[in-house]
Amino acid sequence: MDTRWTAVLVEKFGHSFSGYDLHTGTRRFTVALPEYPHEFAIDRDRLLGYVGHYGVQTFAHPGDGGAAVIAVDLARGQRHGVLDCAPWHRIHGLQIDAQGRVYALSERDNMLLVFEAPSARQTPDRAVPSGGVKSHLCVLSRDGRRAYVTSLLSHTVTLVHPHDATRPPLAARAGRRPEGCCLSPDESLLYVASRDEHRITRLDAHTLAESGTAETGEDPTRLYWSPCNRLIALNYGERSLRFFDPYTMAELARVDTGAKPIALAFHPADPGHAWLALNDDSVGVLDLRTLALRHAFATGKEPDGLAILALPQP
């Protein structure tokens, strides 16, 4: 089967999910979505995208928001189905574990929902409290047994056990307004970015004991572990990327982005390059060896989450 490398992304203010040819920037498809979709996750076969219907413009806007996860067929470029999250609303953080289970985080109700067979059942099989207030993002161990939730109003990160509700959430501090988070590849370390304190905190992924910090630029919103074993912070306020040694927490490099950086994605077959969504409605490509950043292609309004996939030719 012939495939083309494709960047798929949410266009938050365009209320859509689109795919772009990675080399030409040509739009391959656009799927209309309800107002203000935000985060998404890709299934194990890398053929379905699950998009959370947040339903309000930003975390600072009032409203109940949406109560669904929309499945998008990435090969056909069309809607595939809907997972019903009601009565839980403002679906933001989205994750998928190694077994294909979908995890959806309700920011309004501070609940983590689990869809154990999303292709067969469109309602949650499990729901567990996040242990925080205004729970915004989450990251997941590969087996789905541990979830880490950052909450904007309780200013906490919590360790949640989605498949054992008898275990209460374990909370820790990681600075005010923690948001971006990621696990080390061996899942022993958790990294959390504080938007208000401009800092990364490293925590033991089992105990949440702090083991190091690093200062970032203004307003770090996302963290990524790169193929070259660097921790990358996206600084929304500073309009920059900063690179850190994840073991020593030493800063290694800075890349100014011009526009505000929103999301980063690595190429599965080309570990030397990453693609960066920017708030000027564009995607840039970053050479991870030279740290040169250049324009790649224009997008719809406010690109958000981003992934690089080999999708079948139409």
Each language-model region and where it sits:
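Predominantly soluble domains enriched in secretory-pathway, periplasmic, or organellar proteins
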Residues: 1-314
